Design a protein with these regions (language model features):
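Core SAM-dependent methyltransferase catalytic element
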Residues: 222-240
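Class I SAM-dependent methyltransferase SAM/SAH-binding core
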Residues: 78-148
């Protein structure tokens, strides 16, 4: 997929020295956790505690915070980040969101999950991360985003975030991508919203989402440009 290859190129430039790894990802199965373990191990070797595909919480907060404020029907609002990796999205929501949130980050890679748990408990400077709201919570669990039965019950999240995970899974074939979409909808509450962040053009992504979520509303909002690249937030709402 051109979008993922482009994102990998940008990510490699940002990371500084991972060209060989990006090539490995382009030719490997995204469902193989060993590939992601290698990626996240290399990330941990650097001085930056988190690594983001596309963009991080800093860029996303202007879009997310108004949605969280508007959606405050239950406190704290439950948020799931599928394929969280070592992104700053979960930690940013936990430490900087003024609204109460209960955030769960799941990832296939045990290396990524262990790193984020360590960051949560010890922080970059040895201090635990502090919540932006006293009622906020943050947890990380190793799990396959295509099968969340062991970690998430049906209808248990008001907001599901997917930042680049669909892009990666789709490289392994459409059945896996649509299984990911189905699982996101299973754990989403009837009033909830799935948000996919990607640089993939709406002319490509929207028909895929409409096919995989009949009866739902698919909306698109342009984000950025960040680093010279325009991104998109794909919002899918409604019960299947």
């Amino acid at each position: 997929m051109a979008a993922l290859r482009r994102a990998l190129h940008v990510a490699t430039l940002a990371a500084g020295a991972r060209g060989a790894l990006a090539g490995s990802l382009a030719g490997s199965c995204p469902a193989d956790h060993r590939l992601w373990d290698k990626l996240h191990s290399d990330t941990r070797a650097g001085s930056v505690p988190t690594f983001d595909w596309f963009f991080g919480y800093e860029e996303a907060q202007g879009f997310l915070l108004p949605l969280l404020k508007k959606s405050q029907a239950a406190c704290p609002l439950r948020v799931l980040d599928v394929g969280c990796g070592t992104s700053s999205l979960c930690t940013g929501l936990y430490t900087r969101c003024p609204h109460p949130v209960d955030v769960l980050g799941v990832d296939l890679s045990p290396v990524a999950v262990a790193h984020m748990k360590s960051l949560l408990e010890g922080g970059q400077d040895g201090k635990p991360l502090c919540p932006g709201h006293p009622a906020s919570q943050l947890h990380f669990v190793q799990a396959d985003a295509q099968n969340l039965e062991s970690v998430a019950s049906s209808g248990s999240f008001r907001l599901v975030l997917d930042k680049g995970t669909w892009d990666a899974v789709a490289r392994g074939g459409w059945p896996g991508a649509y299984q990911l979409l189905s699982e996101c909808f299973r754990v989403l509450s009837p009033q909830g919203t799935l948000i996919q962040f990607s640089d993939e053009d709406p002319d490509v992504r929207v028909p895929c989402l409409e096919q995989g979520s009949p009866g739902c509303t698919v909306m698109v909002q342009e984000l950025g440009p960040f680093g010279g690249i325009t991104y998109f937030a794909y919002l899918v709402q409604g019960s299947l």
